[in-house]
Amino acid sequence: MKHNLYQICFILFALSVEAIYSQTYIVADTGQEKFYNNTEEITAPFPGEDYYGQDAHFDGYQPSYTDNGDGTITDLNTGLMWQKAVSEKMTFDEALSSVDAFSLAGYDDWRLPTIKELYSIILFSGVDPSGWQGSDTDLLTPFIDTAIFEFEYGDESAGERIIDAQYWSSTIYVSTTMNGNETAFGVNFADGRIKGYPAEPVGPPGQEFIMTSFVRYVRGSEYGVNDFTDNGSGSVTDQATGLMWIQGDSEIGLNWEEALSWVAQKNTENYLGYSDWRMPNAKELQGIVDYTRSPETTNSAAIGPLFTCSVITDEDGEDNYPFYWTGTTHANMQVNGKYAVYISFGEALGWMEMPPNSGNFQLLDVHGAGAQRSDPKSGDPSDWPYGHGPQGDVIRIYNYVRCVRDAGSTDIEENDDQNTPDKFGLIENYPNPFNSTTTIRFSLETHGDVSLQIYDITGRLVETVVNGTIRGEHEVVWDASGYPSGVYLIRLSHGDRTHTRKTLLLK
């Protein structure tokens, strides 16, 4: 019987591995490696401590590129090929029309990227220079890998701001911003945000403002298409990304520290049968935005109908939908780690003074549902009665939470005796997925011969990490630098009891 159960485990394991490698929408990691509290960088918190569970605790698919040496860059995660160079700034219409005649490296099938394609190359190792008074851009760190892609800040000598490094996407907002402006989404790789920008001239005749932005063309198979399945248990799995989401949300606004604690409590409760939920990082959460939906056009949040979103009363007393926290800190040169990233699934509201200097403020959808901005992690929203920044971004601080987990990280157990992993068993190793090293945690309530072994996908024993007599809770580091990328099985044995978990090594 035990042999049969062991075979079943490997069948289930193989199926989960097949699912991992059939993902069509790989969400690369944000690149955030620093840890923060509400204001500044800190050492890495341990499980159970304040601020545990933020972005830097979890390593996803690491950004990986090949410079093809011909002016193009290939993303090894997404399969997309990118233009390496920085274009001249152009209007939205020019960005769309110029691609028809664009040829590079012998290819003529380039296109303007969608917002999800463009956001796939953002990095949150960047630092927002907003408010910085310097001029030497060599001191700045943008939100893109400049060892791979060419990048320029805004040209102050031409009257631009340093942060004017917006890039057009092809994604048009299904509603309008400001006072009825046709809008296209873009990514600002200088300050690390998604906003909707005017796609057409705005303003009175003869005084129109014409938005121009950089362009980085892309080619390759379609990227960023979700494949959601309602699991019928309060969760939704995206087969395309391999991520499982809770179907609902926190149903209450929380500051950032409270949001992390809320997720930790869900794990303590073994919510929906799982104890490895996390607050999503910025790229994971943006990955479930549905840019065909908005409060104005579909009377819904910008998310698919399998999900439910709390309805809030916005700053104008109207029904709207929340901002949702991510575990990603939005680092800033002036205030360090005070802000964290959120995704607006409702309208991205802002207070606009109209006309300027009139003292008359109007609340408008300034950036569009699906925008990515940031909020202070703590404080009192009333301290920002007319928002923050040039478009008066509303400050809420108490935002909502939707947790996520890796759909393929379910525990695998070999017998019915293993029902108390808090006494005997493996705890989720971290990071997972990992690059080179991962910390394996386990507990044992009595003395006895313990074996902690690592197997590859074929069932071959590759390493024995622990073999001895141990009691209590333990952590050991597995150095996998000598092994190839792939899925591995961690197996803890004590007498006739075993507990098995999967882990993914990515190099």
Question: What is each model feature region?
Answer:
Residues 418-430, 434-507:
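C-terminal outer-membrane/trafficking sorting elements
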Residues 410-416:
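Short, compositionally biased serine/threonine- and acidic-rich segments at solvent-exposed termini, linkers
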Residues 21-111, 115-277, 283-410:
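Glycine-aromatic-enriched surface loops/turns that form tight recognition elements
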Residues 1-9:
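Bacterial N-terminal signal peptides that target proteins for export
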